[in-house]
């Protein structure tokens, strides 16, 4: 409001009438800001009131200790002061004036106190302390969300969800063996940090140099080309602390992460895929390059143990989201951890699967949403799991024709179609929404974080109303 007033004032060249009006609005804005600490939901007033009560109780305690003499003195002083004032001004005038003076002093004192705290705690932040307190209070009341997956899809979802809740847990696959993560995994013996780095950056509230630094990728330097600073940082912390989970916790504090990021397992997991033509492919990076339909995937060790923090997050979840992301290399690897699948099945929270916008050449050629769901069911069945892990599906309405779509089609990818009747006939409840990032603002066909998270939260609220 204040910025709009200032801009409007400048655009009229500082005319006297407009200047006066702007000053009036500015005064009203300042009063509103001063009173805003009284708004509900800040979890602040209760502690101020308790502090005030404590001071009063302490005063009475000291008075009793001193044989009540301070109270007598105080009462006598108040009566003397009131009597002296009312000799010159009637009570009908004196009372309201003194009352307003007291209220004004309280408001002014609290306002200046919060301003001082704001300058001390975050001198480089434009947002006012009360705005931050209100936003944090709102986020703390958000649902407890668990998002399971990996790759770009999961980090895209997290970027949007952090606007609705601070109680988010991302359970991330750790089977990557390509690129920077693969090199660090082979040479340092650490778990691949790439997907975890992306999720930490997505959940970071420190939208500044720190996040950019964490995502920075070296383009030159012997041994550094292709590595991101965040991958090196996480790998170094893992070597120092002894495990990736502790390294993530330390990194989360540095980046002011809203929520938590948890690896699906601490095991050194390697993926394999069995193709429909009988071939067997080793390694996550190789699976993404296959040109034959995948029958199923597995991993070494065969049944990796889940982290207790991942299981605890699922048990406490109010909403569980699977995907979006690469079907065989981002989503299903998490479901190779038996304890995670068991925890999902036991959870009473609504569980929703988000399908990709486009197929991936070689990996999901020709699959529509029904095909993706059947692939998940088949994978679980190969592990002896016949009970469904989700009953809700979120899919994109349609991918609009564009030169970008033509480019994808030329590379062997195509929009993932959604046959609502087929899915509903199988007992799934399907929701569709416009989830695609604007063509004019993106060089890729990806989910839009804001649209995706809005659709997820709309589903959650609808579910809560109906159940």
Describe every region a protein language model picked out.
Residues 2-125, 175-291, 455-458:
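Electropositive, gly/pro-rich neighborhoods at or near active sites that engage anionic ligands
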Residues 4, 15-38, 366-467:
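C-terminal functional extensions of proteins
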Residues 127-141, 306-311:
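A short, basic/flexible loop-to-alpha-helix module at the beginning of a structural domain
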Residues 138-165:
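Acidic, Ser/Thr-rich low-complexity segments on the non-lumenal side of membrane proteins
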Residues 152-158, 180, 329-336:
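Short glycine/serine/threonine-rich phosphate/pyrophosphate-binding segments
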Residues 166, 347-351, 390, 428:
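A short helix->loop->beta-strand "cap" motif at the edges of active sites that frequently abuts
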Residues 317:
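An anion/phosphate-binding loop that grips the pyrophosphate of nucleotide cofactors and donors
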Residues 334-340, 368-372:
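Charged helix-capping and loop-helix junction motifs
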């Amino acid at each position: 409001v204040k910025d709009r007033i200032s801009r409007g004032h400048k655009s009229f060249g500082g005319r006297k009438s407009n200047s006066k009006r702007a000053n009036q609005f500015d005064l009203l804005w300042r009063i509103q800001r001063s009173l805003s600490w009284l708004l509900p939901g800040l979890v602040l007033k209760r502690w101020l009131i308790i502090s005030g009560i404590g001071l009063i109780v302490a005063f009475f305690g000291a008075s009793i200790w001193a044989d009540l003499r301070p109270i007598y003195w105080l009462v006598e002083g108040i009566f003397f002061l009131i009597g002296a004032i009312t000799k010159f001004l009637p009570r009908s005038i004196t009372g309201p004036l003194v009352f307003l003076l007291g209220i004004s002093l309280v408001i002014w004192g609290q306002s200046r106190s919060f301003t001082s705290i704001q300058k001390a705690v975050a001198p480089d932040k434009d947002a006012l302390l009360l705005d931050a307190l209100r936003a944090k209070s709102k986020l703390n009341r958000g649902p407890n969300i668990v998002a399971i997956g990996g790759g770009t899809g999961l980090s895209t979802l997290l970027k949007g969800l952090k606007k609705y809740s601070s109680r988010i847990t991302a359970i991330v696959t750790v089977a990557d063996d390509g690129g920077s993560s693969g090199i660090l995994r082979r040479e340092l013996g650490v778990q691949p940090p790439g997907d975890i780095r992306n999720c930490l950056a997505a959940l970071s509230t420190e939208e500044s140099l720190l996040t950019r630094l964490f995502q920075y990728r070296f383009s030159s330097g012997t041994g550094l080309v292709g590595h991101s600073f965040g991958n090196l940082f996480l790998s170094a912390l893992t070597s120092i602390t002894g495990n990736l989970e502790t390294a993530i916790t330390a990194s989360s504090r540095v980046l002011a992460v809203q929520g938590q990021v948890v690896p699906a397992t601490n095991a050194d997991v390697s993926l394999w895929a069995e193709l429909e033509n009988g071939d067997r492919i080793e390694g996550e990076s190789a699976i993404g390059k296959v040109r034959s339909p995948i029958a199923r995937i597995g991993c070494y060790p065969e049944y990796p143990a889940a982290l207790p923090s991942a299981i605890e997050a699922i048990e406490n979840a109010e909403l569980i989201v699977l995907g979006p992301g690469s079907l065989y290399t981002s989503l299903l690897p998490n479901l190779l951890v038996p304890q995670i699948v068991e925890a999902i099945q036991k959870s009473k929270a609504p569980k929703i699967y988000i399908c990709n916008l486009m197929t991936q050449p070689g990996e999901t050629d020709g699959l529509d949403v029904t095909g993706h769901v059947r692939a998940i069911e088949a994978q679980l069945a190969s592990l002896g799991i016949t009970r469904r892990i989700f009953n809700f599906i979120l899919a994109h309405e349609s991918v609009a024709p564009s030169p970008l779509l033509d480019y994808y089609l030329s590379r062997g990818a195509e929009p993932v179609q959604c046959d609502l009747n087929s899915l509903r006939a199988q007992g799934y409840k399907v929701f569709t929404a416009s989830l695609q990032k604007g063509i004019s603002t993106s060089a890729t066909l990806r989910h839009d974080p804001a649209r995706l998270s809005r659709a997820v939260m709309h589903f959650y609220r609808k579910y809560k109303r109906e159940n």
